[in-house]
Amino acid sequence: MGDDELAEIRRQRMMQMQQQQMAEQDQIQRQQQMQAQIQSVLMQVMEPEARERLNTIRLTKPEFAASVEQQIVSLAQSGRLRQKITDEQLRQLLTQIVPQKKEFNIRRVG
């Protein structure tokens, strides 16, 4: 391989890396915009106490909080929310969503 071929390979590699970096930045920007839209909707449809509870849940269970947020946003977009969600209503929603834990009673026989 000559110097020209190596330079061309390096140039192509640099272009690929730049394109990949730009694509990643675009993806991050889209995610940030989507998150901002979700937060905007939540501010419109939830009382401050309910948002605070959801933020507290996000600290311990981020995937679960994201799922709850998506459900609330879909309820708001479908027009099924007639008033702001209060803390008590959020609690009720959470009890419906949280999967029931199976309890195991282990008894020693013998």
Swiss-Prot record:
<dbReference type="GO" id="GO:0003677">
    <property type="term" value="F:DNA binding"/>
</dbReference>
<dbReference type="GO" id="GO:0005829">
    <property type="term" value="C:cytosol"/>
</dbReference>
<comment type="similarity">
    <text>Belongs to the PDCD5 family.</text>
</comment>
<dbReference type="InterPro" id="IPR036883">
    <property type="entry name" value="PDCD5-like_sf"/>
</dbReference>
<protein>
    <recommendedName>
        <fullName>DNA-binding protein Mlab_1482</fullName>
    </recommendedName>
</protein>
<dbReference type="InterPro" id="IPR022889">
    <property type="entry name" value="DNA_bind_arc"/>
</dbReference>
<dbReference type="Pfam" id="PF01984">
    <property type="entry name" value="dsDNA_bind"/>
</dbReference>
<dbReference type="InterPro" id="IPR002836">
    <property type="entry name" value="PDCD5-like"/>
</dbReference>
<keyword id="KW-0238">DNA-binding</keyword>
